[in-house]
Each structure stands twice: as C-alpha cells, then as structure tokens.
C-alpha cells in the first residue's frame, strides 16, 4: 500500500520531462510576474479609476465629528456606527454658535485649499446599484395560480347544444339568451320609432348556435373553452 502511494509522488525534474510547457508556465508565475505578486501582497489596486475620484471638502460638522467620533468609539467599543452617528448629531445640535464658529472657519479654509487644488471640481455622487427585487415565496405563487384557475369556468359544446358546467354559467347563459342586439340601434342612435327594431333583432342564442359548426370543424368531438369573470 505504501509503495503505491510513493510511486505517485513526482519530483520537479520528472514533471518537467513529462510536460515541459506546463512546468514553464507554472514557474513563470513566480519569476516573470513579480510585479503582480507584489501588488497582491501590498494590496495595491490595479485599477486607476479609484485614484481619479476626488473627495468633497469637509464641512463644519465633519470637521468637528472627526475627532469626537474617535473618542466616543473608544469610550463605547460595543456601540454601533449608526448609534454613534445619531449621538454625534444630537450633540452637534446642542452646541452654541460660538462653539461651532471655529469649525466653520476651518471648513472655509479647507474649501479654499480644495478650490486651489482642484479648480474645475464638480461634485458627482456615485450612483448606487439597484437592489434586486425579492422573489415571491413558493407558497404565495401557488396561491396566485390557484386563484387564477378558480376564476375560470369551463363549458363544452356537443353537437350544436351548449352543455355548461356550474350553476353560474347556467344562470348567466339563461340571462344572456334574453338579451338582444340590434343593428339599427348602433346605426341611428336618435331614431325615435321602436317599431322597426323587431325586424333587426338578433338574439345571442342564435349567434351561439351559428358558431357551433366552426368549433366542430376545428376538432371532432368535444371542445372546451374558458371564460374569465
């Protein structure tokens, strides 16, 4: 058993004889690419886009809170950064104008230095990445599908006779048969005589019976259609 394991161990010379190209590529990572290894060890960023970003000049509150934040963090190591920010904002509001004046003067000095150093500076805030929409849980999606299926009421056609399933369809079909559609009413809305309407009446039942051969020509036997309420 130990002999088999020892046979699998190869020296670098044997690896070079079997696959000299692979050995050369592996060795070049440590010899020819020293600059990349140095950057990884030192943590330098290869991209130069971050170096082009210019920070905004500090305002009076930031000048004051920079030192105050450190003291609060040292005094309360368990306090979160958000809680520290709330406390600093509360303390800053309680300061008088005389106490804030030195920090406003320092902020004005930093602003003048910033303008001299970056004359064409314009504040361009970074765009925040859009958060991905949370997916609905599987249970809610199933309930939506069930609700959609329940609203569909099927009925079938058989040899020119309408056979409906469900009391709702039967009641609505009986009501729809009594409703009439008149062509002359749409052609002339202001027609005063209702005597000529009887000649142009077309009931819904006759329209359904006229459409039965079309459904029978599509598929022999029974064909099922779904109506949504």
Swiss-Prot record:
Acetylation of Lys-130 contributes to its nuclear localization and enhances its interaction with KPNB1. Deacetylated by HDAC3. GO terms for cellular component: cytoplasm; nuclear speck; nucleus. It is found in: Nucleus speckle; Cytoplasm; Nucleus. Its main location: nucleus. Keywords: Acetylation, Activator, Calmodulin-binding, Cytoplasm, Differentiation, DNA-binding, Nucleus, Repressor, Sexual differentiation, Transcription, Transcription regulation. PROSITE patterns: HMG_BOX_2. InterPro entries: HMG_box_dom, HMG_box_dom_sf, SRY, SRY-related_HMG-box_TF-like. Belongs to the SRY family. Transcriptional regulator that controls a genetic switch in male development. It is necessary and sufficient for initiating male sex determination by directing the development of supporting cell precursors (pre-Sertoli cells) as Sertoli rather than granulosa cells. Involved in different aspects of gene regulation including promoter activation or repression. Binds to the DNA consensus sequence 5'-[AT]AACAA[AT]-3'. SRY HMG box recognizes DNA by partial intercalation in the minor groove and promotes DNA bending. Also involved in pre-mRNA splicing. Interacts with CALM, EP300, HDAC3, KPNB1, ZNF208 isoform KRAB-O, PARP1, SLC9A3R2 and WT1. The interaction with EP300 modulates its DNA-binding activity. The interaction with KPNB1 is sensitive to dissociation by Ran in the GTP-bound form. Interaction with PARP1 impaired its DNA-binding activity. This is Sex-determining region Y protein. It comes from Cervus nippon. The lineage of its organism: Eukaryota, Metazoa, Chordata, Craniata, Vertebrata.
């Amino acid at each position: 058993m130990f002999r088999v394991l020892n046979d699998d161990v190869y020296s670098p010379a044997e690896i070079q004889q079997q696959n000299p190209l692979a050995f050369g590529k592996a060795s070049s990572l440590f010899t020819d690419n020293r600059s990349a290894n140095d950057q990884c060890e030192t943590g330098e960023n290869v991209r130069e886009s971050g170096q082009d970003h210019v920070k905004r000049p500090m305002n009076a509150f930031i000048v004051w809170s920079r030192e105050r934040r450190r003291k609060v963090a040292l005094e309360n190591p368990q306090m979160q950064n958000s809680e520290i920010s709330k406390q600093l904002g509360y303390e800053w509001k309680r300061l008088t104008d005389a106490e804030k004046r030195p920090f406003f003067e320092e902020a004005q000095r930093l602003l003048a230095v910033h303008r001299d150093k970056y004359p064409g500076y314009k504040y361009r805030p970074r765009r925040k990445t859009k958060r991905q929409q949370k997916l609905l849980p599987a249970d809610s999606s199933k309930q939506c599908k069930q609700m959609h299926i329940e609203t569909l009421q099927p009925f079938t056609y058989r040899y020119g006779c309408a056979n409906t399933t469900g009391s709702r369809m039967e009641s609505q079909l009986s009501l729809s048969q009594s409703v009439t559609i008149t062509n002359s009413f749409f052609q002339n809305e202001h027609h005063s005589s209702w005597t000529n309407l009887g000649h142009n009446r077309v009931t819904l039942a006759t329209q359904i019976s006229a459409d039965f051969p079309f459904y029978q020509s599509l598929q022999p036997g029974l064909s099922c259609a779904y109506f949504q309420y």
